[in-house]
């Protein structure tokens, strides 16, 4: 497998380190704003060099956000490249566009890491959906909220105190809005429902 990597932040660097230890795959190009000076890897700021590289069969999107991640991913798919992403916001927002395109092109679109990556949540939902009818999906979708609510309920902490404790322990970001305002759970619930029930929910249909 020959990979084009989009983004070289925390996620992108982690992907690079994992793949660098593998013999069955390699990163041919990385598209990012700053040159990380890596051996044996071409670094570019022009995404089109990855799209036009015929040796690259898979693009790993590690940019985050919706734009330009969506435009880059779609262009890569139009060029016949498989996609791997952990970007739950991207997949939730454009599920009914990207998944049909992958089927039309005969491509693999892998987004298991977007929700419960460590337990293979989405891949298990996908397998279950193929062989039986799923009636309900439920679970703890956000670890930050789970910790805060547990601390408030079980320990009697106030919200502000529980949040500060979660931040001190590294469970919550310094800017926790995506977690505590339900956005992260929103994306995960939409994506899980789309796969479990074979539907195409979007952010307009599911209020938060």
Residue ranges of model-derived segments:
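General beta-strand structural signal in soluble alpha/beta enzymes
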Residues: 43-44, 61, 84-86, 109-113, ...
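Oxidoreductase and adenylate-handling cofactor-binding alpha/beta cores
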Residues: 119-134, 145-160, 187-201
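Glycine-rich adenosine-cofactor-binding loop
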Residues: 2-17
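Rossmann-fold NAD(P) dinucleotide-binding segment
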Residues: 45-86
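Rossmann-fold NAD(P)-binding glycine/threonine-rich loop
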Residues: 70-75, 79, 86-127
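NAD(P)-dependent dehydrogenases' Rossmann-like dinucleotide-binding region
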Residues: 134-145, 207
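Substrate-binding/catalytic subdomain of NAD(P)-dependent oxidoreductase enzymes
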Residues: 161-208
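NAD(P)-binding Rossmann-fold cofactor-contacting core
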Residues: 21-39
């Amino acid at each position: 497998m020959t990979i084009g990597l989009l983004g070289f932040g925390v996620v992108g660097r982690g992907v690079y380190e994992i793949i660098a230890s593998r013999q069955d795959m390699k990163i041919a190009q990385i598209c990012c704003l700053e040159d990380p000076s890596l051996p044996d890897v071409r670094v570019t700021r022009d995404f089109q060099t990855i799209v036009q590289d015929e040796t690259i069969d898979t693009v790993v999107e590690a940019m985050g956000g919706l734009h330009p991640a969506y435009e880059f991913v779609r262009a890569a798919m139009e060029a016949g490249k498989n996609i791997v992403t952990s970007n739950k916001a991207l997949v939730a927002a454009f599920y009914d566009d990207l998944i049909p395109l992958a089927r039309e092109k005969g491509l693999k679109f892998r987004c298991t890491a977007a929700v419960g990556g460590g337990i293979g949540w989405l891949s298990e939902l996908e397998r279950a959906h193929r062989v039986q009818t799923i009636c309900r999906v439920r679970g703890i979708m956000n670890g930050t909220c789970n910790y805060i609510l547990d601390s408030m309920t079980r320990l009697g902490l106030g919200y502000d105190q529980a949040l500060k404790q979660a931040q001190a322990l590294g469970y919550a970001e310094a800017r926790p809005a995506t977690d505590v305002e339900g956005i992260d759970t929103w994306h995960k619930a939409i994506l899980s429902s789309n796969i479990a029930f074979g539907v195409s929910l979007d952010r307009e249909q599911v209020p938060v």
